[in-house]
């Protein structure tokens, strides 16, 4: 029952990491035709960063199109994070994956519980969680905060922007292979390739444009920003008035229309991560530009 005839072709990309042979073999046992890339001895010779995001998933995107596969399933080096590619070779973001997995757990498996996300997560996950009757808990960036919440009980699923998705009934930790298997089963149950599932999701819950920029600063500038940020309360950004200002982890501004901006200095290096979500690429980029200016101290507050 795990795969209908139409969706028996998948590209699996373990990125030369721990999922080599595992995910591909599990799917083959279920009758899926699998093309595994970045695996076996050849993978040692390839220059790849085992991070399931663009540009590192480009090879997988090409393989999906060449094979006429219904999806590409990507796991990072230690197989706890997931990325995906749809049948059109389009990169599917972890938020979209988490939203699909959540929908599957509630609608097909009749499970319930809280949904735990980092504050850098897309509002898409919150919108679908609320529509499905799940309460949402927001934590700082880092899966350890989500895992701690899972251990308290009552949690269905937890996920982070970087692609870590954990299902509490399985274990309070991320599992990229499990997330891939659930995606596969969902394609079989709905008889739809991945891109169609994502389009349906966005038709129902709204389409947004999400982005992140990593800004490298001088060490002392990063330290200054870390010190000053808790006191920053902008009255408006890009002509929008923040409805909610959070200093839980960096500075997060949420606007009335569900768009938002997060400026978050790294705890380990002189890098500031700027995240934003808008209803168009232009709006998202305008917010990202403002966030970068804010981090550099050049935004007029």
Residue ranges and their predicted role:
Residues 1-4, 8-190, 203:
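Phosphate-binding chemistry for phosphorylated carbohydrates and sugar-nucleotides
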Residues 71, 111-301:
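Phosphate-binding and adjacent anionic-ligand microenvironments
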């Amino acid at each position: 029952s795990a795969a209908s005839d139409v969706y028996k072709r998948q590209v699996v990309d373990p990125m030369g990491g721990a999922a080599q042979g595992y995910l591909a073999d599990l799917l083959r046992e279920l009758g899926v035709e699998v093309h595994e890339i970045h695996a076996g001895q050849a993978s040692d010779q390839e220059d790849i960063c085992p991070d399931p995001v663009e540009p590192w998933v480009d090879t997988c995107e090409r393989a999906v199109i060449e094979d006429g596969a219904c999806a590409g399933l990507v796991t990072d080096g230690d197989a706890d994070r997931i990325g995906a590619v749809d049948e059109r070779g389009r990169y599917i973001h972890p938020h979209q994956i988490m939203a699909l997995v959540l929908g599957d757990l509630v609608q097909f498996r009749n499970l319930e519980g809280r949904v735990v996300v980092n504050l850098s997560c897309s509002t898409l996950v919150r919108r679908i969680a609320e529509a499905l009757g799940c309460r949402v808990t927001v934590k700082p960036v880092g899966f350890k905060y989500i895992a701690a919440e899972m251990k308290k009980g009552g949690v269905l699923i937890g996920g982070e922007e970087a692609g870590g998705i954990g299902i509490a009934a399985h274990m309070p930790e991320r599992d990229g292979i499990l997330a891939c298997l659930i995606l596969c089963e969902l394609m079989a149950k709905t008889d739809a390739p991945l891109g169609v599932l994502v389009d349906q999701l966005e038709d129902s819950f709204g389409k947004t444009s999400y982005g992140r920029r990593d800004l490298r600063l001088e060490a002392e500038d990063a330290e200054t920003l870390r010190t000053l940020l808790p006191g920053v309360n902008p009255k408006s950004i890009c002509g929008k008035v923040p409805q909610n200002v959070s200093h839980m982890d960096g500075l997060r501004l949420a606007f009335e229309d569900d768009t938002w901006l997060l400026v978050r200095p790294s705890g380990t290096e002189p890098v500031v991560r700027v995240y934003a979500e808008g209803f168009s690429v232009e709006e998202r980029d305008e917010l990202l530009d403002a966030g970068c200016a804010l981090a550099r101290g050049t935004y007029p507050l």
